[in-house]
Regions:
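ATP/NTP phosphate-donor binding region
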Residues: 356-437, 707
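Glycine/threonine-rich beta-strand-loop-alpha-helix active-site module
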Residues: 53-54, 58, 421-533
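Short, amphipathic C-terminal "tail helix"
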Residues: 716-759
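Gly/Pro-rich interdomain helix-loop hinge
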Residues: 627-719, 759
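Conserved C-terminal structural/oligomerization subdomain of aldehyde/semialdehyde dehydrogenase
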Residues: 215-355
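Carboxylate- and glycine-rich phosphate/diphosphate-binding segment that chelates Mg2+/Mn2+
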Residues: 503-612
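Rossmann-like NAD(P) dinucleotide-binding subdomain of oxidoreductase/dehydrogenase enzymes
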Residues: 2-133
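ALDH superfamily catalytic-core signature
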Residues: 25, 30-34, 103-234
């Protein structure tokens, strides 16, 4: 789809009280990209934060060519100023986000305008719906942005046959059902005399709302469910039928499809026309009927309204922070407003679960003697990338015996946690020698460096900072990796049994004082050679650290939101092999049977995490490792027991993922315990026995159980906690964890890693 837009001129932007900075930033970016000047009128209650946000953006824009004064704020709160601007001949367009009064004033100005009014989003759960998915989606949506985002669900209309089952699932996932008396007390304290919601209630937590209303709720309550009458006349008169920008969700029992759709229509008629609605059903006829009846610009089918309406995650709608409500809501468009179109359009968007993948190197050779495969590759000139230790102990000379008459050049400057400068030096070496193959022999750092060297050699225009930008889906991101065929072959030969880098599309590098992770299948080696004899010289500590790294890969891939039957098979096998063979390899480095099993297990775990990816344990290990120089495998081992128990508990926030329709991490841990014959009559027992087995392994291979044990200074660590939490939060590994780690939870995990063993 191609959209063409021309500058309008001077745009007057009205900002709401509930989203003053995000709306200001979004409108500023759209205005700047379409070469429009923006004048903003913020809410009087949010003028300072909006003004500061726009000031920062204007300054940043000027550094790259934005004309001065393109983005301006007039914070004077008086209505006379607004009226003056509404009718000023120099204002070409008005873009309003706000309540009914702001929309009416905009429409009365007599200028071209876009109005985004209040939302009052209904969601209809049909008896054919996937109830577990519906509950997780609604909780994701209703708790998004402190519950103040206007497309979030406000009233849930539930088919009577599944009403009790759905409420039970809500309760299990952390919502609390209020009694009629509690609903009455809540209304008494949060509804103003004119029937509107008191400002003090907006964006409050469940506990704070309970305190305001004088009711009791459990400490972990995510959303309060308020039963509303089924009778449509009584429902229309209820004060909680309106938009509730707080974690309060009305629930209505519906006796029929007709009643359910009528109830949803009634919700939209209470200042929600044109905005957003959702329906959960497996019956396309039901979603079609819903779409034909409900007058909203966004109709989400089997997707959460808040995250889904914003576009780009659960569907292919245009990403936005400004939602058109069409003529129903006093606007000129129903689009997700960005830079285009003057039409009212109903966008019926179905949840999209994109196809998954399983991508591996073209050839993988394993077991003793696999280095002989180098003879079959017909290499004329090779650059061997390695580290000083591997070169000193003769591993490069060992390679030469299999390369025949090939010219061999050696780049041995790679250090642990390779820095960008080392990668650039390697690129210079590639330019000097112009080989037809790069052979990266060493640990994970060497192989990661080799991947990055080939990438920047073949595509010198790429920039590390852009390639490392965060993303949710590798197919929908800002940074573009090259798609052309490689000009040189990359051969990965691991000398440790742990990283799995030989089969992974990731490269972890150090840029400045932080770790960055490049992830793309263009980084995948062409050939992986797993020669177990190369691991025989690993010291005990390296054997333990790298083996625990592989175990973490397998366990995190097993519960990733991208896990699949393909990756599960590899993850399960890797866990089994590591639990069985790592203690043997640790105790007796000459035990080649155990060494071979561990070399293969590390690669098998690599095949799992290369396609399912990892989670919060790796994010924490990357952050702590970069800051305090703790080895990656050791840091993983310290955090792993805490992360296992964290992921097995009820999430405070679910990870949005179209293919991940129910929270199954606890079940999968129990399944792993059952498959390995650890016993247990219940899922909880099987889970706990798996966790105990992991603890036993960590003790057996002498992994320190706390950061204090490895010598991290307590005062320095405590001072670094905010920085570490931020680094972990920005780490790409975190985006495939089965639950969203909140900052406070990351801090808890970081403190637990310092304190030691879980209780």
């Amino acid at each position: 789809i191609k959209y063409v837009a021309e500058p309008i001129g001077v745009v007057l932007g009205l900002l709401p009280i509930t989203n003053p900075t995000s709306t200001a930033l979004f409108k500023s970016i759209v205005g700047a990209k379409t070469r429009n000047a923006m004048i903003f009128r913020p809410s009087a209650r949010a003028a300072r934060c909006a003004s500061r946000a726009i000031e920062i953006l204007q300054a940043a824009g000027e550094e790259v060519g934005l004309p001065p004064n393109t983005l301006q704020v007039i914070p004077d709160p008086t209505l006379d100023v607004s009226q003056y601007l509404f009718h000023h001949s120099g204002v070409n367009f008005i873009w309003t986000t706000g309540g009914p009064k702001a929309v009416r004033a905009t429409l009365e100005a007599g200028k071209p305008c876009l109005c985004v009014g209040p939302g009052n989003a209904p969601v209809y759960v049909h008896r054919s719906a996937d109830l577990r998915m519906a509950v997780v989606d609604i909780l994701i949506s209703k708790t998004f942005d402190a519950s103040v985002i206007c497309p979030a669900e406000q009233t849930c209309v539930i088919d009577a046959p599944v009403y009790d089952e759905l409420l039970a699932e809500f309760d299990r996932m952390g919502a609390q059902l209020l009694t009629d008396a509690e609903v009455a007390k809540l209304c008494e304290h949060i509804i103003a005399d004119d029937g509107s919601i008191e400002l003090i209630a907006l964006g409050q937590s469940c506990l704070n709302l309970a305190g305001i209303a004088g009711i009791e709720v459990r400490p972990d309550a995510k959303v309060l469910l308020a039963p509303l009458p089924s009778d449509l006349e009584q429902l229309a008169a209820h004060p909680l039928l309106q938009e509730k920008l707080m974690p309060v969700l009305g629930v209505v029992r519906s006796p029929s499809l007709e009643h359910g759709i009528d109830a949803c229509a009634l919700v939209t008629e209470h200042e929600g026309l044109g905005h957003t609605s959702a329906v959960y059903t497996r019956d396309e006829a039901v979603s079609d009927r819903f779409a034909q009846t409900i007058q909203t610009g966004r109709i989400l089918v089997n997707a959460p309204t808040a995250v889904g309406a914003l576009g780009g995650i659960y569907n292919s709608m245009t990403p936005t922070f400004s939602l058109g409500c069409g003529t129903w809501g006093g606007s000129m468009t129903t689009d997700n407003i960005n830079y285009r179109n003057l039409l009212n359009v109903k966008a019926v968007s179905y949840r999209q679960a994109p196809p998954q993948w399983f991508r591996v190197p073209a050839d993988t050779y394993f077991n003793s003697g696999s280095l002989d495969a180098l003879r079959q590759l017909h290499i004329r000139q090779a650059l061997v990338v390695t580290d000083p230790i591997c070169e000193d102990i003769g591993m490069v000379d060992q390679l030469r015996r299999y390369l025949g008459d090939a010219a061999v050049h050696v780049f041995s400057e790679v250090e642990p946690e390779p820095r960008e400068e080392q990668v650039r030096a390697g690129v210079d070496a590639l330019r000097r020698f112009e080989p037809d193959a790069v052979i990266a022999i060493g640990g994970g750092s060497v192989m990661d460096a080799g991947k990055a060297m080939r990438l920047f050699y073949e595509s010198p225009e790429l920039r590390m900072r852009e390639l490392a930008l965060p993303f949710l889906d590798a197919r929908k991101r800002v940074a573009q990796y090259p798609e052309q065929e490689h000009t040189i072959k990359l051969i990965a030969v691991p000398t440790t049994a742990g990283t799995g880098s030989e089969v992974s599309p990731a490269a972890v590098l150090t840029v400045g004082d932080r770790k960055v992770t490049l992830v793309d299948y263009s980084l995948l080696p062409d050939v992986a050679i797993i020669e177990p004899t190369l691991t025989a010289s690993m010291p005990r500590q390296v054997t333990a650290d790298s083996g625990v790294d592989a175990l973490t890969h397998a366990l995190e891939a097993g519960v990733s939101i991208f896990a699949s039957p393909y990756t599960d098979a590899f993850a399960m096998q890797a866990v089994n092999m590591i639990l069985t063979n790592l203690p043997r390899a640790f105790e007796d480095g000459s035990d080649m049977e155990a060494r071979t099993a561990m070399a293969n297990a590390a690669t098998i775990a690599g095949l799992a995490f290369s396609n399912a990816f990892v989670g919060v344990c790796h994010a924490l290990a990357h952050a702590v490792g970069a800051r305090f120089h703790v080895s990656h495998g050791r840091a993983n081992g310290i955090f792993l027991p805490h992360v296992l128990r964290y992921n097995a508990s009820l999430p405070s926030k679910f990870m949005p993922a179209p293919s991940y329709t129910a929270y199954v991490a606890p079940e999968k841990y129990a399944q792993i315990g059952w498959v390995f014959g650890l016993g247990g009559k219940s899922e909880e027992q099987r889970r706990q026995r798996l966790f105990a087995r992991v603890d036993e392994l960590l003790d057996a291979v002498e992994i320190p159980r706390s950061l204090a044990e490895v010598g991290v200074p307590e005062a320095e660590y405590e001072a670094a906690l905010p920085e570490l939490a931020r680094a972990a939060l920005m780490d790409p590994s975190i985006r495939t964890n089965p639950r969203i780690p909140m900052v406070i939870e990351l801090l808890d995990l970081l403190r637990a890693g310092y304190a030691g063993r879980p209780a």
